[in-house]
């Protein structure tokens, strides 16, 4: 059984009432009602197509992809670089 590679994205909304419309695009991990954004996890191979589709929805203000793949996660010896 292989582990499914997933990537997170932050979706900023104009209104919180539209948050439930995004449940079909991926797994909603967190919904901040005060700051009006959601954190959604999507399969890594589908992230480009899903983010383009979500950006074109009229109730979405902004979509930001997670940068966890770009960050060097080898923390041993980072103080001396």
Swiss-Prot record:
Pfam families xref list: DUF2129
One GO CC annotation: cytoplasm
The keyword Transport is annotated on this UniProt entry: no
Cellular location(s): Cytoplasm
InterPro entries, sorted: DUF2129
Entry keywords, A to Z: Cytoplasm
Top-level division of the source organism's lineage: Bacteria
Family indicated by similarity: Belongs to the UPF0298 family.
UniProt protein name: UPF0298 protein SAG1583
Lineage: Bacteria, Bacillati, Bacillota, Bacilli, Lactobacillales
